[in-house]
Amino acid sequence: MQKLVAFWQLMRADRPIGTYLLAWPTIWALMIAGAGEPPLRIVVIFLLGTFVMRSAGCVINDFADRNYDGHVRRTRQRPIPAGRISATEAMIGFIALLAIAFGLVMQLNTETVMLSFFAAGVAALYPFCKRWTHLPQIVLGIAFSFGIPMAFTALESDQWFIAGLLFLANILWTVAYDTEYAMADREDDLKIGLQSTAILFGRFDRLAIGLLQLATLALLGWILHLITVELWVWLALAAIFLLFAYQHWLIRHREPGKCFQAFLHNHYIGMVFAIGLAVHYWF
C-alpha cells in the first residue's frame, strides 16, 4: 500500500494542476475542431490521455532529476529522493504509463497515432533539457501543446491555420506560466546548476512573462475573430487579461511562494477560455 501511495504521489495525481494545464488547451482544440460538438468517445479518450501522459511526464521528470531534487527545498520529499520509490521502479512505472497511453491513442486514426509518437518523445526529452539549455520551458510548451494538432487530426478537421495559432498561443502561455514556476525554484536551481527561463530572463523576468502573456492574448483574440464569435464572448478574453494582471500582482516581489501561487492560478486561464468557446458554440 505504501508503494501505491508513493507512486500516486510520483505521478502527481494528488496535485492535478499539471493535468488541468494539459487538458484545457486540448479541450479548446476539441471544441474548435468539432464545432462545439466533438464526439463524447473522443473527448473521453483525450481526457484520459492527458491524465496518463501528464503522469508519465512527472515520473520521467523525477527520474531525470533524482540526483537534484534532494537539494531543492520544494522537492526533497518527493518519492525518489525520499527513498520511497527506486529509480528502477520509476522507469517501470513510466513504461507502463506509456503503454496505457498507447492503448488509448490506438483507438484513434493513423495520423493521430503518428503524432502521439512525437508527443511522447518531446515529453521524455523535456526533463533532461534543464541541463543544457536555458529554454526548457519552450520544450515543455511544445510537449503541452501536442494535444492540439492531435485533436484536429482525430476529428479530421481542415482548420489548420487556426490549429497552428492555437498551438503557438499555448506554447507562449506555457513558457509564461512555467517561468513563474521556475521563479519559485530559481535560487536552488542556480546552486545546483540547472537552467531555466527564469534564470535567463533575470531581472527582466516579469517583463518577459508580460510580453508572453500579451502575445498569447493576441493569438487567442485572432482565433476568436476567425471563428466569428459574438461580441460578448470577447468578455472571456477580457477576463483572461485581468487574471494575468492578478498574476503580476502576485509575483511583483518575486517571493517563491507567491510565484508558485501565480503558476497555479493559470488553471483559471484555461477554464475561462474554454467557457468562452462553450458559450460561442452552445448558446
Curated annotation (Swiss-Prot):
UniProt KW Zinc keyword: no
Transmembrane segments: 16-36, 40-60, 85-105, 108-128, 135-155, 160-180, 204-224, 226-246, 263-283
Gene Ontology molecular-function annotations: 4-hydroxybenzoate polyprenyltransferase activity
GO biological process: ubiquinone biosynthetic process
Membrane topology note: Multi-pass membrane protein
GO cellular component: plasma membrane
Enzyme Commission number(s) of this protein: 2.5.1.39
CDD domains to which the protein is assigned, alphabetical: PT_UbiA_COQ2 (cd13959)
Needed cofactors: Mg(2+)
Cellular location(s): Cell inner membrane
InterPro entries named in the record: HB_polyprenyltransferase-like, Prenyltransferase, UbiA_prenyltransferase, UbiA_prenylTrfase_CS, UbiA_sf
Keywords: Cell inner membrane, Cell membrane, Magnesium, Membrane, Transferase, Transmembrane, Transmembrane helix, Ubiquinone biosynthesis
Pathway the protein contributes to: Cofactor biosynthesis; ubiquinone biosynthesis
Record field: catalytic activity: all-trans-octaprenyl diphosphate + 4-hydroxybenzoate = 4-hydroxy-3-(all-trans-octaprenyl)benzoate + diphosphate
Function: Catalyzes the prenylation of para-hydroxybenzoate (PHB) with an all-trans polyprenyl group. Mediates the second step in the final reaction sequence of ubiquinone-8 (UQ-8) biosynthesis, which is the condensation of the polyisoprenoid side chain with PHB, generating the first membrane-bound Q intermediate 3-octaprenyl-4-hydroxybenzoate.
Protein family: Belongs to the UbiA prenyltransferase family.
Protein name, as recorded: 4-hydroxybenzoate octaprenyltransferase
